[in-house]
């Protein structure tokens, strides 16, 4: 009988250990946040070769054109890019996963149904052209409108410190717009974020992207 109870106890211990490992695995995987569709536009003053390298504190999951050790393209003032095979692109695209935290100390609480108007106004303040803003909105609008409300914060150092851009030749103006959002069922109070952008002068680089952040 003693041996029987020992076997049962041993089985319980194994089951508990397995359950704990599964729980820990679930918690660890839930902290991974995906940076979705950051795209990079290059606008030199004259046609020239440009190299772009990512210094990303995470794992790249998709790039187009293929990233390899970086991108090297011929960029034109209107933003058209051509690689060494002659293939033309509108922008450089990448996605990645990371486990760093985003800053929601300031931002906006926006009703899902008001997302389009909010983005049009916010992206203009952040320096995107109408074409760039349109591409941002058509990608993110369906996700934002699906929620009752969204806490939205445009990331600054919390993003750029973990996702650096190394560009040669060095651009005169860099505009990086990265939107982190958290769905919520009700309106939340949050200090309003001030939005601005540098003037576009000389060789200008623009990047936009976003993610649904873990509410933590």
Regions found by a protein language model. Give the residues of each.
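N-terminal Sec-pathway targeting helices
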Residues: 1-15
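Eukaryotic extended interaction platforms
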Residues: 18-19
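Protease-labile, long low-complexity intrinsically disordered regions enriched in Pro/Ser/Thr
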Residues: 23-216
